[in-house]
A protein has these predicted regions:
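C-terminal domain-tail junction helix/linker
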Residues: 177, 202-247
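Hydrophobic beta-strand scaffold residues
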Residues: 62, 182-183
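Basic, flexible linker segments flanking DNA-binding modules
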Residues: 1-96, 190, 245-246
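Short small-residue beta-strand/loop micro-motif enriched in glycine and branched aliphatics
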Residues: 125-131, 184-186, 210
């Protein structure tokens, strides 16, 4: 009986180690559901209930808002650039065929200075296709991010944004027309319409945690690493728990 009990305790320790390593590997971001999938890929089969108990015994819990630019812009000079929510009216066949990008800004205060990041994600492929950073939340920064994305991934069929002033502008509208890209805008105060990039920003902020001790250069490096990690290593539930670039 003593030997059997010892074996059970050793096996339990191995389970704890496996769960903890998977938890740490992905920066403490995932809970029992995602950890179960990650462990299964390593031929370790534990129930969600068991994983939940182990996390509790280890005294750890998954992370899981966000500061951002104003997402609704109204001006008599630019209101004619406001677009409808075209994406909501696409058929499933069109969504599966078209390359649609979702883009938006997020901000972080580092050493008392605001740094804005404009990012763009592929709705279908879940790849962060491009981004740009700057000290101001401007149309120019949005256009720089878009140029970076097109350079790396070509021209999309449609772009989704909110109604922020950066997107309700003459220059951004002209860029969409020049490239023949359809522009879909969220309804006012309805971030769910542009949920794809919204979800990415939420995941990034939660998984990176506090950044109190970072300087600007280090923060930019951290963002660069996270985007690499997200595209190449982080499992994505809608892609069968494989990273976007491996799907």
């Amino acid at each position: 009986m003593r030997r059997d009990g010892a074996r059970r305790r050793v096996y339990k320790a191995e389970q704890k180690q496996a769960v903890y390593e998977a938890f740490v590997e992905h920066h403490g971001s995932f809970g029992r559901r995602m950890l179960k999938r990650i462990l299964e890929r390593k031929s370790i089969h534990l129930s969600e209930y068991k994983i939940s108990k182990i996390l509790k015994e280890l005294g750890v819990s998954p992370k899981y808002g966000r500061k951002r630019c104003k997402n609704v812009h109204t001006s008599k000079n630019t209101e004619h650039y406001i677009q409808q929510n075209l994406y909501a009216h696409l058929t499933d066949e069109e969504k599966s065929r078209m390359e649609v990008w979702s883009m938006d800004f997020t901000e972080e205060k580092i050493n008392g200075k605001k740094i804005y990041t404009c990012g763009i994600i592929s709705v279908k492929r879940k790849i962060l296709v491009g981004y740009a950073q700057g000290s101001r939340c401007t149309t120019a920064l949005a256009m720089e991010a878009f140029a970076n994305a097109m350079l790396a991934h070509g021209i999309p069929d449609m772009v989704m944004t909110d109604r922020g002033s950066q997107f309700v502008s003459k220059d951004f509208h002209a860029m969409m027309e020049d490239w023949g890209i359809k522009h879909s805008m969220s309804r006012p105060y309805t971030p769910v319409d542009n949920r794809f990039i919204e979800t990415f920003w939420k995941s990034m902020k939660v998984e990176l945690g506090k950044k109190d001790l970072l300087n600007e250069a280090t923060y930019r490096m951290v963002i660069e690493y996270y985007i690499f990690y997200y595209n190449n290593l982080r499992p994505h539930s809608t892609l069968g728990y494989t990273p976007p670039l491996a799907a």
